[in-house]
Amino acid sequence: MKRTFQPSVLKRNRSHGFRARMATKNGRQVLARRRAKGRSRLTVSK
């Protein structure tokens, strides 16, 4: 049986990376929330 999680760095960054977050208003809100919370990593991309 094929597993549901088939990792791809490219897809991961395009969906959840920093530039993807910055591209939309809501994405920027996500970053603002994570900054306010004090997250060491804001997004999955390095």
Swiss-Prot record:
What stretches pass through the bilayer?
Answer: none
For the region Disordered, give the residue spans: 27-46
The answer to whether keyword DNA-binding applies is: no
Task: Tell me the NCBIfam families matching this sequence.
Answer: rpmH_bact (TIGR01030)
Species source reads: Serratia proteamaculans (strain 568)
Which family, according to UniProt? Answer: Belongs to the bacterial ribosomal protein bL34 family.
Protein known as: Large ribosomal subunit protein bL34
* HAMAP family in alphabetical order: Ribosomal_bL34 (MF_00391)
Q: Show the InterPro entries listed in the entry.
A: Ribosomal_bL34 (IPR000271), Ribosomal_bL34_CS (IPR020939)
One GO cellular component term noted in the UniProt record for this chain:
ribonucleoprotein complex
